[in-house]
Amino acid sequence: NILKGDKTGIVEPSRDHILIGKERHDIGRPNNEGYPIRGIFKGDYLYLKNFKIDRWPAGNPETGYLNSDGGPTKTAILDTYGTADKKYWEMSFGKRPEEELYNIKTDPLCMNNLAVNEEFKAKKDELLNQMKAELTAQKDPRILGNGDVFDNYRTFPPKFMNYHNRFMDGEEMPKLH
């Protein structure tokens, strides 16, 4: 058993990776839409597939990037927008590419996206194919082409439904915390 055993590292050879996914996590996008991601950690690599790259990953700017809690760090990063140090804003709140690949051993903060580097195409394709095969076997709607079903599930209390749309219409909104 991997939880109760004395061994470290890869204890069971079939358990050499982790699949990850995200759909809806905040109320700061139009029509309660999510930011769907699927990914796989394996060996030294993290591969991410961003499915709706036209959307803001941390929530829309006009509602305050609601997928990121307020605080001094968020404020400091937001203050870099429009400056020479804008890279911190881009990494935290900017739109993401369709594919991301990171070597988590040499780049644990995931700052250097290798997906655009031809040298890593084989690794990217290997991870993508394994991820898709496993998620297909699990009948993941996103991988099977019906991922928009996730945007139709009611996941927020009624007072927060359609928050973005109501905010943009000038409605006084309930406090978030």
Please report, for each region that a protein language model flagged, where it lies by residue.
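C-terminal cap/loop subdomain of S1 sulfatases and analogous C-terminal strand-loop tails that border
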Residues: 1-100
